[in-house]
């Protein structure tokens, strides 16, 4: 009532823009890291064929799946740590 009490402060447009930019940077960085790691692991350094082989495609598929699964698991673990009040280096 009347702006007093438990109302959360409004986030400004500038803060929303900064948060969106930070999220975009994070997603772009994660994508670039994924491409670099899976490409170096799965694609032969000397291209013998103009198309991705079945073996390379399977490796890439597994690499991407593992990468995302790992990120989900890490995110869930960090969320649990945050909810329980644990922080890095402290248990």
Curated annotation (Swiss-Prot):
Cystine bridges: 38-63, 42-59
GO terms classed as biological process: protein insertion into mitochondrial inner membrane
Protein location: Mitochondrion inner membrane
Chain location of the short sequence motif Twin CX3C motif per the record: 38-63
Keywords: Chaperone, Disulfide bond, Membrane, Metal-binding, Mitochondrion, Mitochondrion inner membrane, Protein transport, Translocation, Transport, Zinc
Gene Ontology molecular functions: metal ion binding; protein transporter activity; unfolded protein binding
GO cellular component labels: mitochondrial intermembrane space protein transporter complex; TIM22 mitochondrial import inner membrane insertion complex
Bilayer topology annotation: Peripheral membrane protein
InterPro entries the record matches: Tim10-like (IPR004217), Tim10-like_dom_sf (IPR035427)
Assembly notes: Heterohexamer; composed of 3 copies of TIM9 and 3 copies of TIM10, named soluble 70 kDa complex. Associates directly with the TIM22 complex, whose core is composed of TIM22 and TIM54. Interacts with the transmembrane regions of multi-pass transmembrane proteins in transit.
PANTHER family reported for this sequence: MITOCHONDRIAL IMPORT INNER MEMBRANE TRANSLOCASE SUBUNIT TIM10
Function: Mitochondrial intermembrane chaperone that participates in the import and insertion of multi-pass transmembrane proteins into the mitochondrial inner membrane. Also required for the transfer of beta-barrel precursors from the TOM complex to the sorting and assembly machinery (SAM complex) of the outer membrane. Acts as a chaperone-like protein that protects the hydrophobic precursors from aggregation and guide them through the mitochondrial intermembrane space.
UniProt record similarity statement: Belongs to the small Tim family.
Description of its domains: The twin CX3C motif contains 4 conserved Cys residues that form 2 disulfide bonds in the mitochondrial intermembrane space. However, during the transit of TIM10 from cytoplasm into mitochondrion, the Cys residues probably coordinate zinc, thereby preventing folding and allowing its transfer across mitochondrial outer membrane.
Name this protein carries in UniProt: Mitochondrial import inner membrane translocase subunit TIM10
Source species: Debaryomyces hansenii (strain ATCC 36239 / CBS 767 / BCRC 21394 / JCM 1990 / NBRC 0083 / IGC 2968) (Yeast)
Name of the gene encoding the protein in the UniProt record: TIM10
């Amino acid at each position: 009532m009347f702006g007093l009490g438990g109302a959360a402060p409004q986030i400004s447009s500038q803060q929303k823009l900064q948060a969106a930019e930070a999220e975009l940077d994070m997603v772009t960085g994660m994508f670039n890291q994924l491409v670099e790691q899976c490409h170096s692991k799965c694609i032969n350094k000397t291209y013998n064929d103009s198309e991705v082989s079945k073996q390379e495609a399977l490796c890439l598929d597994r690499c991407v799946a593992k990468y995302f699964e790992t990120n989900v698991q890490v995110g869930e673990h960090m969320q649990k740590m945050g909810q329980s009040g644990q922080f890095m280096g402290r248990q």
